[in-house]
Amino acid sequence: LAALLFGGNYLTVQKKRQILTQSLERIVKDNPSQINALADYRFDFAYIKKAALILELMSKEDSAFKAATVIVPDTIGNKQVYLAFSADSQLSGIDEQAPNARGVGDDNGFVVTRNGNKETISKTQYLYAPNLSEREYLQRVFAGQTNEIRYEAKDGNYSLCHPYRQNGETIVLCFSDYQQYGKIGS
């Protein structure tokens, strides 16, 4: 019985990997201008808004995954960090980026006007905290040492991360899904 359960889980993990890989390859192939826009990273209102919209469309374009995220390297102070943006990154209720409001605080945040009030948006709001193996993977990707696609399956959570390079800039696109009980179709 244990061998049957283990074998079923293994087949589910491999099938999900194949589905996510095919979906990711199609999304990248069908959306070159959107991928290029994501690769043109700068920490400002326009980028966050554009990235959230692109990632929301990608996550709704294919039922094989529930969420799309872009991970980019950046710095806060002198510390190298990773920032992650998703469809949930939308800055709802924001009217506009306040004029001359760049470089606010230690992390070069910016000021926006939300419902008539000024509000600071900081990089720390978008920090991505990878586990050790993810951090090692991201370090290799952003150092230009690998183009490896990273797949992870754990407790019914599936994620596939794909490095993308454009005009000397590197981003990592991650697509993820959750399957209750780890079964396809359950």
Task: Tell what function each PLM region has.
Residues 9-21, 30-39, 44-47:
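Membrane-proximal amphipathic alpha-helices
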Residues 27-30, 61:
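Structured segments of extracytoplasmic/periplasmic soluble domains
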Residues 36-186:
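Extracytosolic and intramembrane catalytic regions of membrane-associated proteins
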